[in-house]
Regions:
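Structural signal for hydrophobic packing residues in well-ordered secondary-structure cores
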Residues: 9-16, 34, 96, 139, ...
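Intrinsically disordered, low-complexity, positively charged segments
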Residues: 1-63, 148
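Conserved active-site and cofactor/substrate-binding residues in soluble primary-metabolism enzymes
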Residues: 3, 18-21, 25, 39, ...
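Helix-rich terminal scaffold detector
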Residues: 1, 162-289, 293-298
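Short, hydrophobic/aliphatic alpha-helical segments
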Residues: 26-40, 77-89, 278-279, 283
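Flexible glycine/proline-rich
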Residues: 5, 19-24, 33, 75, ...
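Short, glycine/charged-enriched hinge/interface segments at domain edges or termini
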Residues: 7, 52-214, 349, 353, ...
Length: 395
């Protein structure tokens, strides 16, 4: 499993072109170029409080200032100069007038006529924000490959960025294969099952900001599978299929990919997940996921997601686990990496009662996955384990 991921990371590169987007419409987009700050934030020295502004700090004891006429307010800066020994009324966010650098809170002073009385000590620069205290002009805000979040939009606009260069959305063709499948909303025969994989995969890909090319359900017919792959390769940057990845007589996907001589990493050591086929079709990467919905879901998060992120320009995404105590017992044999449907409750990780890959309900019961390593493991209650929340996979 680890070797397969490393091989994917080494071989895959960004396949999408770039374009410019306004910052307002950039949520979820991947930067194709680093962004630097055209303006400092804050752009000018300003007051952090309502009070009075003057020059220099105060030593211990009583002090008296001459009050200047006027004031400095946010958006209405004082145009004059405040001389030594003078003070001026100022409000939160207002620019510090020329000749000042320190602000005293309004509740800490006494005003009598044109005189301002205040007791020290007070450090020079108190209650004032310097220009560029948050971000300095020219600073790199985000590197290429960063996926823009809502909070990033606030930062970009704060420093005057109006547009950003981003990668175009990765186009992912999604198809399901199998004669046993019927479309949702139709009446299923007793020997049919509803195609749940394709709608599930489409929803996942949309969460990841990708453009969906829906290829529908493809029957178990080699010529029809080839035709669907041809059409998908013309419309998409990558192809995601479910079903037909095993070596059964009616599972044509793996056989067709093998014919081209471009299929590799056959039968990844992952549970649930085998079989999993990887190949190329007309120069387009193909991920042949298992037909089982649980296995397809897990393989998409654990295996396909890092590769899709690499292809989309955001880099090979490896989720960060939480290390938490288990609230279950399990003996795992050596041989393959296992992922258990699990959820976090009261600071502990519960595992779904059944490990059967046919139990689709376990995906909704869970809010994440427990990862167990390739080697043999005996998990006991209270033991620290790796838990990956669904959110760590971008869901």
């Amino acid at each position: 499993m680890g070797d397969a991921l490393s091989l994917l990371e080494a071989r895959l590169q960004t396949v999408v072109d770039s374009e410019y987007s306004t910052v307002f419409n950039s949520d979820g987009r991947v930067l194709a170029k680093a962004v630097t700050a055209p303006r400092s934030h804050p752009p000018y020295a300003n007051s952090a409080v309502d009070g009075y502004v003057f020059f220099g700090g105060l030593s211990k004891g009583a002090h008296c200032f001459e009050l200047r006429d006027g004031r400095s307010a946010a958006g209405e800066a004082f145009a004059g100069v405040v001389e030594s020994g003078q003070a001026l009324r100022i409000f939160t966010g207002a620019a510090l007038p020329q000749g000042t650098d320190t602000v005293v809170l309004q509740e800490d002073v006494l005003v009598e006529g044109s005189k301002l009385y205040v007791n020290g000590p007070l450090e020079r620069g108190a209650n004032a924000r310097s220009s560029g205290e948050d971000v300095v002009q020219g600073a790199v805000l985000f590197a290429a490959g960063h996926r823009i979040q809502p909070q990033d939009i606030g930062l970009l606009i704060s420093v005057g960025v109006a547009q950003v260069k981003v990668f175009k959305a990765l186009r992912v063709a999604v198809m399901s294969t199998g004669a046993e499948l019927c479309a949702p909303g139709t009446e299923a025969r007793l020997d049919q099952v509803f195609d749940s994989n394709r709608p599930m995969l489409k929803a996942i890909l949309q969460r990841w900001g990708m453009q969906i090319v829906d290829m529908g359900i493809v029957p178990d017919d080699a010529s029809l599978v080839r035709q669907a792959l041809d059409e998908a390769a013309q419309q998409a940057d990558v192809i995601l299929t479910s079903g037909g990845a095993s070596s059964g007589d009616e599972d044509h996907m793996s056989a067709i990919l093998s014919e081209t001589g471009n299929m590799s990493l056959w039968r990844i050591a992952i549970k649930p997940g085998r079989p999993l086929a990887l190949g190329m079709w007309s120069g387009v990467p193909v991920f042949g996921l298992p037909g089982n919905p649980v296995a397809a879901f897990v393989c998409t998060l654990v295996f396909a997601r890092p590769a899709l992120m690499q292809l989309s320009g955001s880099g090979f995404a490896r989720p960060q686990p939480l290390t938490l105590p288990a609230n279950f017992n399990k003996n795992k044999k050596v041989g393959r990496r296992e992922y258990l449907r699990a959820r976090l409750r009261n600071g502990e990780v519960e595992a779904f009662t059944s490990e059967g890959s046919g139990r689709v309900s376990g995906l909704s019961w869970a809010d994440g996955l427990v990862e167990l390593p390739d080697e043999a493991v005996q998990v006991t209650a209270g033991q620290l384990i790796k838990f990956f929340p669904y959110s760590s996979f971008g869901l």
